[in-house]
Amino acid sequence: MGRVRTKTTKRASRVVIEKYYPRLTLDFQTNKRIVDEVAIIASKRLRNKIAGYTTHLMKRIQRGPVRGISFKLQEEERERKDQYVPEVSELEKDKINVDQDTKDMLKALGYDSIPTVVVAASRPERPFRYRH
């Protein structure tokens, strides 16, 4: 069974990561020294728990965004992804190929005036074969 981390440990680790992300690494010993420098922690055991959870979160951050932690680099990455505009829109097509049945359904619904809908040549249906 694993150990449960307290709210104090988790909150302290998140704050340390948000403020000092560029200085932290994936190494526990390095993170332990950084946590010792930047925070006043009452006991050695609590410092080690915070450093351990910080290292754990840093490894998770390497794989992707972590819920509850936002730092400048992650915000910039999210902004860049949100602002992306493709060169060719998927919504604006020159023509849409449909079969005759679909064209008839569009006509019945009153959408027969769409200029981009083109009836594609229907393929001859192959007879269904059973596997023996």
UniProtKB/Swiss-Prot annotation:
Q: State where the protein is found.
A: Cytoplasm
Matches recorded under PROSITE patterns: RIBOSOMAL_S17E
Q: What is this protein called?
A: Small ribosomal subunit protein eS17B
Give the protein's biological function.
Component of the ribosome, a large ribonucleoprotein complex responsible for the synthesis of proteins in the cell. The small ribosomal subunit (SSU) binds messenger RNAs (mRNAs) and translates the encoded message by selecting cognate aminoacyl-transfer RNA (tRNA) molecules. The large subunit (LSU) contains the ribosomal catalytic site termed the peptidyl transferase center (PTC), which catalyzes the formation of peptide bonds, thereby polymerizing the amino acids delivered by tRNAs into a polypeptide chain.
User: Where mainly located?
Assistant: cytoplasm
Q: Which organism is it from?
A: Schizosaccharomyces pombe (strain 972 / ATCC 24843)
Question: Which residues, renumbered to this chain, carry the PTM Phosphoserine?
Answer: S43
Misc. remarks from the entry: There are 2 genes for eS17 in S.pombe.
- What InterPro entries does UniProt report for this protein, alphabetically? Ribosomal_eS17 (IPR001210), Ribosomal_eS17_CS (IPR018273), Ribosomal_eS17_sf (IPR036401)
This protein's encoding gene? rps1702
